[in-house]
Amino acid sequence: MMRQSLQAVLPEISGNKTSLLRKSVCSDLLTLFNSPHSALPSLLVSGMPEWQVHNPSDKHLQSWYCRQLRSALLFHEPRIAALQVNLKEAYCHTLAISLEIMLYHDDEPLTFDLVWDNGGWRSATLENVS
């Protein structure tokens, strides 16, 4: 018996579609962080005041926070292939994180920085995502 094989050529994502994908992921992540009914655990999205009651300089706490946030984001955002979470600042009244993201169908890493500011998360990098 002769076996036939089918080959499918997958279309490459154009630069414009990649840019739209990146912006969409960042926008959705920012919405997830700022949602009052977020699926993420309270400490991960609220930052303050919950962060203040803990010792923000505790390296064990920082490592735990990054692991928990990474796990939750990978669960809730299926377009992310790989993720690294880093704390940029962790002080009593300041919490800044950097997400190093690899998306499916995108060969370039995406950096998304978030800062806890006046009771909500904001992004300094969303406008620059391309």
From Swiss-Prot:
MF-aspect GO terms: anti-sigma factor antagonist activity
Signal peptide: none
InterPro entries in the cross-refs: Anti-adapt_IraD, IraD/Gp25-like
Biological process, per Gene Ontology: cellular response to oxidative stress; DNA damage response
Main location: cytoplasm
Lineage: superkingdom: Bacteria
Keywords: Cytoplasm, Stress response
One of the record's GO cellular component terms: cytoplasm
Compartment(s) where it occurs, according to its Swiss-Prot or TrEMBL record: Cytoplasm
Known function: Inhibits RpoS proteolysis by regulating RssB activity, thereby increasing the stability of the sigma stress factor RpoS during oxidative stress. Its effect on RpoS stability is due to its interaction with RssB, which probably blocks the interaction of RssB with RpoS, and the consequent delivery of the RssB-RpoS complex to the ClpXP protein degradation pathway.
Family: Belongs to the GpW/Gp25 family. IraD subfamily.
Assembly mode: Interacts with RssB.
Name under which the protein is recorded: Anti-adapter protein IraD
Species per Swiss-Prot/TrEMBL record: Shigella flexneri
Gene responsible for this protein: iraD
